[in-house]
């Protein structure tokens, strides 16, 4: 490349990048306004220009997940993870989608990967607790909720879930004592 070609390429790259940021912002606004179809079209336009755009893949996945298209959301997260395997946001979102699809063991694998990278991820701890609870591992679930609360004592999801799991354990113990 000549010096002028390099400068032109650089300027074009900045223009395209700015345009993509604007499109992603518009897609987010569409989602907030409930215009899901327009948001998805914008994400697809961005991905046509930049197939490896992690933000577009993630936000598209979240949008699909929010309208109940869990398998498509997981596909979007998988594409993002193939590009950036340790992206915490993508791993958390994929875990939540797998949880919604009742694939609790696979969800836990996502949360465990987050926790390997960030031991103090309150969201990963609480979400893992939810998946453990769904599998009937209430003691382990409570342990994860408590750990999340030890990091952030105001984390509502962990607090409410811990109380619910403890109530379930009490009711199970009560039922067992009645049958004995």
Model-derived segments and their meaning:
Residues 20, 54-55, 88-89, 122-123, ...:
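Helix-start (N-cap) detector for alpha-helical repeat units in TPR-like alpha-solenoids
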Residues 18-55, 59-66:
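Alpha-helical segment of the N-proximal tetratricopeptide repeat
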Residues 31, 58, 65, 92, ...:
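Position-specific recognition of the canonical hydrophobic site in helix A of tetratricopeptide repeat
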